[in-house]
Structures are given as structure tokens and as C-alpha cells.
Amino acid sequence: FEVIVKSDNVCLAFLYKGINTMDSMVGYKNDKYLYFGRCAAKLDDVANFIPARITGLVMIAAAYFVNLDAKRGWKTFCRDRYTHVSPNSAMTESVAAGALNIQLGGGHFYFGKWVHKDTIGDDIRPVKAEDIVTTNNLLYMTAILSLILFALIYLLRIFPVV
């Protein structure tokens, strides 16, 4: 029986967490951390490239299971998944916006300066406070389906179907 936790996997997990933490701390654009922050942000983009896309696809299935508009989630994902400065951020944001029939994003103040950003999703209905609970349910179902998906992949590695 294969041991699940190997030392190289643990090292990769620590490396990933370090990259993610660096991006959170200094990955934004300002004069003080411009180059160091840019390096952290690019490393984070590379580390999350595949996981962001897998999560977006799993979230579309999750939208179906929590009775949201999975079809619109798919359409919005296909159209708006690159509508963000980060190559990964809009992957799940576009699915959530489409599944909830709302529009997200747009301009905002960032460190006291107005920053223009494109919107994600369609302005079909106004955003409501209850959308937070609905989005949390979408998040939980996405996590459950991801766990099932990767457990099945792991089991197929242990017990290959020939």
C-alpha cells in the first residue's frame, strides 16, 4: 500500500504555500515592491494555472447540484474567463457570476486611486445579500465534487482498471 504523504509532496506543498503567501503580501503593484511583487505574482500565476481551470470546470458541475444556472455559468466561463488582469482569477469568478445571473467586477478604488476593470457576467438582476450564502453553497459543493474527483483519480492509481 502506497504511503499518501511523501517528503517530496510535502516540500511541494510548502513551496506552493510560500509562493501563495508571497503573492498575498507583496504581489500588488506599488513602487516599494514593484519587481519583487511582480515575481511573486508571476510565480503564483504559474502555480495556479492548471488548478484554476480545473476548479472552474468543477464549479460548473457544482452549480447544477445546488440548483443554479449551470448553463449560463458555462457560457459566462467561456466568454469572460480571461476578463481579468490575472490569468487565473476570472476562471471561477466568471462561473459564479453566470450561475447567479449577476455581474461582478468593474472599477473600484485601489490604494486611493480609481482603477478601471472590466465587468464579469451579465447584469441580469441586482446583487442581493443572500447571494453570499448561495455563493458559499456553490463553494462547498465545488469542494465536495473536487474531493470526489481527486479521490477517484487516486483510487484508479491504486486499483487500475485494465
What is each of the regions a protein language model found here?
Residues 1-22, 27-162:
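Hydrophobic alpha-helical transmembrane segments
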